[in-house]
Amino acid sequence: MAYAVREGDPTSTGGVVVSASATHQVQERRLARMGDPVWCPACEQVGYIAQGNPTFIDEYVAVATQGHYVKCGCKRGTHTLIATQQSLAADMDATIEIPKDMAKAAKLRAEKMTAVRKAGGPSWDRL
């Protein structure tokens, strides 16, 4: 099943989704979408969700589901999302890649968040 990922959900590298949708929640946690930031302790960077499910849309953005890829400093395919709920799933297990313009904006946001973290900002690995 293509279970929806939420803010605070873990990743395969021990990371965590740090921010998500402002409009939709599941079990009192916001839905994660393509472009949303993810902390990665393996490479010590904030990355972003690089895939989404085209059958599940929030504010014109594909929602992230179990197994979708996180773009960070790690080798492609080694950092994926883990859904912690099983009450909400997409209609189909489908995947699209993040559009280039959205990826560019997500990368800039992730780089800024990484800089803040390195300067003593929030420690997401303690969530």
Where would I find each of the regions flagged by the language model?
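Intrinsically disordered, low-complexity proline/glycine-rich segments
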Residues: 2-127
